[in-house]
Amino acid sequence: MIQHPRIGIRPTIDGRRQGVRESLEVQTMNMAKSVADLISSTLKYPDGEPVECVISPSTIGRVPEAAASHELFKKSNVCATITVTPCWCYGSETMDMSPDIPHAIWGFNGTERPGAVYLAAVLASHAQKGIPAFGIYGRDVQEASDTAIPEDVKEKLLRYARAALATGLMRDTAYLSMGSVSMGIGGSIVNPDFFQEYLGMRNESVDMTEFTRRMDRGIYDPEEFERAMVWVKEHIKEGVDRNREDLILSKEEKEKQWEFVIKMFMIGRDLMVGNPRLAELGFEEEAVGHHALVAGFQGQRQWTDHFPNGDFMETFLNTQFDWNGIRKPFVFATENDSLNGVSMLFNYLLTNTPQIFADVRTYWSPEAVKRVTGHTLEGCAAAGFLHLINSGSCTLDGTGQATRDGKPVMKPFWELDESEVQAMLENTDFPPANREYFRGGGFSTRFLTKGDMPVTMVRLNLLKGVGPVLQIAEGYTLELPEDVHHTLDNRTDPGWPTTWFAPRLTGKGAFKSVYDVMNNWGANHGAITYGHIGADLITLASMLRIPVNMHNVPEEDIFRPKNWSLFGTEDLESADYRACQLLGPLHK
């Protein structure tokens, strides 16, 4: 059984015996326990289990104790460390020198002992040795007897832990390409060096004929297939067929296509993570899967010109339920856009929520909306908005039909209930695919995302000579008047899932206007997650050494390793590029 990645907590202490160290043992170890309790009681793994922490076997005052802690962490699948101390310690003697995992240090802000002095000293050693570390120092002085973790310290500890866990969850997993390059899209030209060096992942690949092989040879669970057919007939609403009359399939042909796309879903899932049921059926090799944390399906055009498209498969892999019940989502990219798949993966690992994959299709200015519909935009939409619409697939969680405190949300699967599942299904239909584009047919997904949800749109791009760069745009989904929505939606493809998105403007750079956001977006796709998580993404990017070229996160929320400030404090964007370039990828 594969262990969850864990956070290692390192209580460091003044090594002087005969009174000094002894007086600090309890306080120092209690700091470590408090941090472990905070993380385990607040954060969860994608499977819903509490995040696990490992505390060093003793306080760390000298090198042998640092070495003992290091050995324990190696055996315990520790993916990141947090060092805590209320006092002076011996900097380079007590630091963790593992170069391939993130590190953070919390120095207690008190007057009795110089925790802040150790923090500064050990961070200087980290910078000198080229091993980045995040510095955490409370804004307010605390009493030595105060065991509470201040709110500003909590925020940084949790931000660090979320991002660090994401690095650990990605390590030693795979990206699975089902097919190859789709329609010349750059993101589907999969770059194995990026995955290996920045994410610690490997690349797997299967030809799309693997789907037809498994169908023809019965390499799927026939009992599950029958159960799925019953569920689909009961719960899935087939939408309006908008095809030309000569392209409309007969009822019998559509029935066959439903069977086909259900099998596609089952096979796509089994390819990613395996299925022990296949071994029982005599298919031991296929039963193991590809250990894929994220995958993509080429589809267009070689597959979709002949077979039903991947929309149903992609939709339900990214959704948190199917005929087997509520479960965690998969991360699955349309058109094998691996870079958007990774963007979705970053979002997912930071939030444990499903992801919207969308084309960044159209910028609608207030003037254009007024001209076309007669409607004057107000509120969040007053400066215009972006039409996010994928060509046929999207997680059903993207409907916004789940709620928390009466507001629409996208939330982890363990919070989802059956009434919310039914609401998602009732607010979605599955029209036959547009056969001018998808000659082989299939069924697209059609819904409208509810408005007033805080969301973050993300995109990873590869820049020759630089490497990966990340873009982040926080904003809100919009709910337009029904007639305005239909007028605008019908100008594209009303059989596809739509999200209206207004990024939050800052008045400068790429966020001077909504037009500038669209104009500076690096690719045709974006990954959209629930919540404003730009600060977490910036922290994660710094751990992976990926510079952020565009974001609208307030400066006070940016949390990067301390040595980033040594690359400059006035122009943080340029300092980020220089730090990432000098340090190089996390796993190189």
UniProtKB/Swiss-Prot annotation:
Signal peptide: none annotated. GO terms for biological process: D-arabinose catabolic process; L-fucose catabolic process. It is an enzyme of class 5 (isomerase). Its cofactor is Mn(2+). GO terms for cellular component: cytoplasm. The keyword Isomerase applies. It is found in: Cytoplasm. It catalyses: L-fucose = L-fuculose. It comes from the Bacteria. One of its GO terms (molecular function) is manganese ion binding. Pathway: Carbohydrate degradation; L-fucose degradation; L-lactaldehyde and glycerone phosphate from L-fucose: step 1/3. Keywords: Carbohydrate metabolism, Cytoplasm, Fucose metabolism, Isomerase, Manganese, Metal-binding. The active site is at residues 335, 359. Its EC number is 5.3.1.25. This is L-fucose isomerase. It comes from Streptococcus pneumoniae (strain Taiwan19F-14).
